[in-house]
């Protein structure tokens, strides 16, 4: 579950950069939470839940190799995310399988926006791809 969730968190990080045409390697907690509430608002219906995910799941797993702040991973909970508490005391239990499927759905939705001639999405995609393709190789001829 931890490896799958780590990959989901990295995919969300990457998709943020494609959604915004961003070359930046760092962005802040608020932008991540905004991304979750904008593109997966069926799962992240409040800032409290998005913040708990960012701090307790994403940062916990990617920076410490564990969930934090009372947040947990599961394969048996009945919803993608079960929420307990509110505000700074919000704790979540994330169903790894369902969440992974939701991230895949989000990526497919993004691909569909590219196919559907969404000009802004395409411009930002091109900007990000140009940045990736223009990087100089570390290998000298």
Regions found by a protein language model. Give the residues of each.
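Amphipathic, Lys/Arg-enriched alpha-helical patches that create a basic surface
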Residues: 74-141
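Hydrophobic/aromatic-lined pockets within catalytic cores
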Residues: 16-23, 40-44, 62, 66, ...
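Anionic, Ser/Thr-rich low-complexity intrinsically disordered regions
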Residues: 15, 20-28, 46, 68-75, ...
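Short, contiguous, well-structured surface segments enriched in hydrophobic/aromatic residues
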Residues: 1-38
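Histidine-centered, metal-coordinating catalytic motifs and their short helical/loop contexts
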Residues: 47-74
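A structural signal for well-ordered alpha-helical segments within the folded catalytic domains
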Residues: 6-9, 13, 30, 52, ...
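Short, solvent-exposed segments of well-ordered alpha helices
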Residues: 2-3, 45-48, 90, 94
